[in-house]
Amino acid sequence: MQAEQEIVVLSNGPGELATWVYPYVTTLRQRVGSRVRISVVMVPCPHASGHEAEIARRYPVDRVLPVREFWRLLITKTTASGWDWLPRGAVVFLGGDQLFAVLLAKRLGYRCLLYCEWQARWHRWVDVIALRRPQPVPPTRAKVAVIGDLMTDVQTLAPEAQPDLRQMLGLAATTPLVALMAGSKPNKLKLGLPLSLAIADQLASATPPIPCVIPVAPTLTLESLSRYADPTDNPELTHIAGTTAQLYQPTDGLPYLETPQGTKVYLWQQLPNYPLLRQVAIAVTTVGANTAELAALNVPMVVLLPAQQLRVRRAHPWDGLAGLLVALPAIGRHWTALVFWVLVAKGLGWRRFWQVLQAPDIDWQLVKEGLGYKAWPNLWAGQEIVPELVGPLDPQAVAEQLIHYLDHPQELAAMKVALQAVVGSPGAAASLVELTLSELSVGKE
């Protein structure tokens, strides 16, 4: 059946693709089959990895436009691959700058829908505003609906794990698994992977040993990941109490990184990785979209913010001029440290911040208080429901905290309940699909 209508999904980064686009387009495809053509258009974003189009092509969509062609599309309505456009359609904003969705909808003559987690902008020029949670919206002609969190639908879309990782590794069904999620970008992996491997060493020496697995980000190959565990390729290993590892890719079984201590950290490449994450007892992760994905699956986690990154990290989650300056090679490292401490000072107040600076040893608990919450579930809840560890992190101390949780399953169960409460119930994707199809019907008039 030839499609008669077009749905153009705008997005910008791996996190938005995994937590917003994937549930939406999967639900949409199940609902409409081939009656509607689904196009994904990647928009400019300073935090994008450059591999977003490749990730989106794995989803049930008809075509994907990489970010390098976005401006040509917006200005000329054409693409290098000669895309055509159906007479009726809708542009659905699922990440990036909301203005891009407004402008592209005007250019194509389509309806415009915004999914808004925090704040709706350009409300006078859109047709539908779908809100994650109730929030004030200025008077507008747009239809406004509260639909919930798209990420909750990950729970229903994630199939049960087959095969079970424990079976593949010959482990007992009751063996707890720990997921190590060190990130997908160089600025996080340079320190995150060596630290994760050192944590795995500590867990392997526990009684009984606790196996670890790394869900490999879709933007990484095994070879590119392993380079961050090689001191020749990653000189930042000297900045953290991490360890090295060597990559092994056996013909039978999962590939793995092996540390000098002999610890094997298994590498999981199946995408989406939700079936694996459902198997783990707890995850160790950096800040970012990982915390939102884990929360959507109700997976307990410990979130790491290593202070060692102040000396080497150039890219970070803050937007604006500071984000651009941090990316400059000449001043990046010093500016990152400056921005970090300014944020701490802003959160604590200058008087308390001055006390932190004057103390012989840094009070990292105060620093953490000044930074505020960084993990998404904590931001949503307004309180710490998953632990955030800030400071010059010690792999042994992190491992001990993980072992504590594994030895106290009631605490893990309570964390799961808290995550489920803050994320909410599934159904947002279906609601957004119905809003979209309703607008397509309006477009027929």
PLM feature spans:
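Nucleotide-activated sugar donor-binding and catalytic core shared by glycosyltransferases
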Residues: 1-445
